[in-house]
């Protein structure tokens, strides 16, 4: 049974989701959001909150692997850069705790969880609730993080029969 951490990075709100992969499916462990505040806090202060928050989640739940969403190019380049920096803070937190880290596009996550890369957030949330047998809707960023964790569990289980379950690239980051 493997504990998997999913991270939906953001410079204002970073979602996290922890699931246990039993080999026959996934079981919900925890989820939530790391909020950096809505004030005009400096970016470096918000990134430090993301880093510390992810480390705290790792220390609390003890996952051995982490899936994180890749940056997409938004219309606003500044937003994409801030998102990339928040991802970096989360990745460093995972790397410091020696987690195996894999990155997924939003389309890959939607495909793995909802069966189509064009699924909307509500469809993804409903599938997350169904797959993890949740009775209440999680926060949207936490739902996205749980979807990333489920995608990572699915991808890991499909790689194991091919002898790639322990594949690692430099620095422990898998590039799928």
From Swiss-Prot:
Question: Which InterPro entries does this one have?
Answer: RNaseH-like_sf, RNaseH_sf, X-over_junc_endoDNase_Mg_BS, X-over_junc_endoDNase_RuvC
Per the record, the major location class is cytoplasm
Q: Which reaction does it catalyse?
A: Endonucleolytic cleavage at a junction such as a reciprocal single-stranded crossover between two homologous DNA duplexes (Holliday junction)
* Annotated GO CC locations: cytoplasm; Holliday junction resolvase complex
Residues that bind Mg(2+) 1: 8, 141
Q: What are the EC numbers?
A: 3.1.21.10
Q: Any keyword Magnesium? A: yes
Q: Name one GO molecular function term.
A: DNA binding
Which NCBIfam families does UniProt cross-reference here? ruvC
Described by its record, this protein's role is as follows: The RuvA-RuvB-RuvC complex processes Holliday junction (HJ) DNA during genetic recombination and DNA repair. Endonuclease that resolves HJ intermediates. Cleaves cruciform DNA by making single-stranded nicks across the HJ at symmetrical positions within the homologous arms, yielding a 5'-phosphate and a 3'-hydroxyl group; requires a central core of homology in the junction. The consensus cleavage sequence is 5'-(A/T)TT(C/G)-3'. Cleavage occurs on the 3'-side of the TT dinucleotide at the point of strand exchange.
What is the protein name given in its UniProt record? Answer: Crossover junction endodeoxyribonuclease RuvC
Q: Which organism is it from?
A: Pseudomonas syringae pv. tomato (strain ATCC BAA-871 / DC3000)
Specify the taxonomic lineage: Bacteria, Pseudomonadati, Pseudomonadota, Gammaproteobacteria, Pseudomonadales
Name of the gene this protein is made from: ruvC
